[in-house]
């Protein structure tokens, strides 16, 4: 899932 404030897919 994409985390906007981290800018990563985890």
Swiss-Prot record:
Which Gene Ontology cellular component terms are annotated?
extracellular region
Entry superkingdom: Eukaryota
Enumerate the UniProt keywords alphabetically: Cell wall, Secreted
Its subcellular locations are:
Secreted, Cell wall
Q: What is this protein called?
A: 20 kDa cell wall protein
What species is given as this protein's source? Solanum lycopersicum (Tomato)
């Amino acid at each position: 899932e994409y985390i906007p404030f981290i800018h990563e897919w985890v």
